[in-house]
Curated annotation (Swiss-Prot):
Protein name according to UniProt: Cytidylate kinase
Compartments (UniProt record): Cytoplasm
Reactions listed under catalytic activity: CMP + ATP = CDP + ADP; dCMP + ATP = dCDP + ADP
Keywords in alphabetical order: ATP-binding, Cytoplasm, Kinase, Nucleotide-binding, Transferase
Highest taxon in the source lineage: Bacteria
Enzyme class at the top of the EC tree: transferase
Record's keyword annotation contains Transferase: yes
GO BP: nucleobase-containing small molecule interconversion; pyrimidine nucleotide metabolic process
Amino acid sequence: MTFKQIAIDGPAGAGKSTVAKKLAALLGYTYVDSGAMYRALTYWALKNDINIHNVEAIVNLCTSIHITFINQDIAVNNQIVNTEIRSPEVNNNVSHIAKIPEVRKHLVSLQKCIALSQNVIMDGRDIGTHVLPDADIKVFLTASTQERAQRRYIELVEKGIQTSLMEVEQGIIQRDQMDSKRQYAPLTQADDAVVIDSTGKSIDAIVEEVLRIFNGKERG
């Protein structure tokens, strides 16, 4: 049996996760937040006082812990870490871990396995170009830096995480630079991806736009 794959890529704060979750619920697909896997590893390293810049230690940690999705929640060794992985500390360190080739190879392998066994909507930075290069639909979702920062700031405040809009915006700018320049699987728009600029658009409007693309593809 062949399963459907929808890949949604884009920079931090573009609305990928929110859009992907809504689409998954509407289509009955499994939602896979690939970025949450890197965040979970980063959080676990920080929690256990492991030096983020110690590549060998991070690789060993990556292959020794169990990162899974439980009813759309992200878990490490069966501990739900949804809120913890969205902290400013994780935001400021996740790119250091995400650029380690051995880490990406291991987590990409897990992501590919998930996509082989069910219909999935997966979001991240390199899904359409590296993880699921043959995805049925590829979307590259973007937005202005200011709007992305505002969205992420509101998200953090609603979760009770103390930060400032300026700190969030600086973190996004730094993340963009690191994601685009990393040597292994950098943030890149797939040649066959549909670009959607979400600046000024509601989540529902973006979801409807992707659904039109999906329905058009299904009709052939």
